[in-house]
């Protein structure tokens, strides 16, 4: 596995929060100079690859993989898609996690699901079901996410307390799988 592929994978999994030079250097066990060379190489790879929809950016001393600017109209159309489209299984999982664990960071959602949740979370934000709800007071200050009033309307409830108690569901499932 090359440093370039490892770097790309880390930036993909980090999603919109990105990773700092220090975090990347530590994870890849590279000097800042060697890491900068790999970042430059990855950036150049995306610039030259007309078939790729991604590019590497540095924002607030954080590196992120983002979509190329020329794709903005297409992505805006996608984001405007009506909510009456069915939500994907991934989006429903993320929405459930946010509803029951809010406020929660994307990384915490990823840890619960075991996979990257950036796309599903972005879609839920675009649909107005989830919103940023501040920053977590830890290193990196990641965004916190919570459900919106539209989520309550969409679910036909007035308060989060009206959501089904998941502990009772877990007990029922456990009882049915014992035999």
Curated annotation (Swiss-Prot):
Q: Which GO terms describe its cellular component?
A: cytoplasm
Q: Where in the cell is it found?
A: Cytoplasm
InterPro entries attached here? ScpB_csome_segregation, WH-like_DNA-bd_sf, WH_DNA-bd_sf
Which keywords appear in this protein's UniProt record, sorted alphabetically? Cell cycle, Cell division, Chromosome partition, Cytoplasm
On whether Transcription regulation is a keyword of this UniProt record, the answer is: no
Query: What GO biological process, any one, is recorded here?
Result: DNA replication
* Oligomeric form and interacting partners: Homodimer. Homodimerization may be required to stabilize the binding of ScpA to the Smc head domains. Component of a cohesin-like complex composed of ScpA, ScpB and the Smc homodimer, in which ScpA and ScpB bind to the head domain of Smc. The presence of the three proteins is required for the association of the complex with DNA.
Its biological function?
Participates in chromosomal partition during cell division. May act via the formation of a condensin-like complex containing Smc and ScpA that pull DNA away from mid-cell into both cell halves.
HAMAP family in the record:
ScpB
The record's comment on protein family reads: Belongs to the ScpB family.
Q: What is this protein called?
A: Segregation and condensation protein B
Q: Which organism is it from?
A: Streptococcus equi subsp. zooepidemicus (strain MGCS10565)
